[in-house]
Amino acid sequence: MDITEYLGSWDRPLDFDSYWNKKLEFINSVPLDYELTEVEFSNFDNLKYYDLYFTSFDGARIYAKFIKPVSNGEVPALFYFHGYPGCNRNWFEKTAYASLGYAVFAMDFRGQGGKSQDIGGILGTTVAGHIVAGIDDELDNMIYVKNILDMCLLIRIAKDIEGIDANNINCAGGSQGGGFATMCAGLNDIKKCIILYPFLSDMKKVYDLDLDLVAYESIRY
């Protein structure tokens, strides 16, 4: 298998483009409702740290870390997505990117141990099973569809924040975060995308290779 030409083992769904075009049209119509609270984290004079909370399309409160370089002009933005399952690590990890001049946005995915709400029947964290959560329901109710829409809404919020260059949006992540960085680049106007071992990219191949373990174990059911 030539990994440079590999396009996955599943056929593209016939309604793929129409479905996501409708979801993008929907999420772009959702009113922006967010709040920024500055955090006392360090004595760095060139960086500002914020807790960012926003209300998503279904009323869930979603959390993201936000670090903004102090600048007289606009700065590029970097969306950093965390691995599965879990939440964003501490501020130090993101500070490395912010020190390069990027405003960093790092969202906690729903129900994976962070501060974002999963209001799909319960409040609080869940340990696993997110891949198949909602699979017997309408497609719109799958938790990963909701996470993708949260991501797209956060990008709109970033472009609304003063001092962010709306024409220089970038994304990065590893594992689950790599999968989300791929989706982020596909659904949004992204300038650069940095992907490290993208989990979620080809679950059928994982199953065929009999590697449905750990993070993938729910697909065997």
Predicted regions and their residues:
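Cap/lid segment of the alpha/beta-hydrolase catalytic domain
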Residues: R89, T95-L149, K205-D208
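Residue in the alpha/beta-hydrolase core beta-strand immediately N-terminal to the catalytic nucleophile
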Residues: L154, N168-N170, K192
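Alpha/beta-hydrolase fold nucleophile elbow
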Residues: E162-S175
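Hydrolase active-site cap/lid region
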Residues: G178-Y221
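N-terminal targeting or regulatory segments adjacent to alpha/beta-hydrolase or S9 domains
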Residues: M1-L47
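N-terminal cap/lid segment of alpha/beta-hydrolase-fold proteins
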Residues: I27-G73
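Active-site loop->helix "elbow" adjoining a glycine-rich segment at hydrolase catalytic centers
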Residues: I143, S175-G179
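Short beta-strand element of the alpha/beta-hydrolase
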Residues: A64-K68, E74-Y84, V104
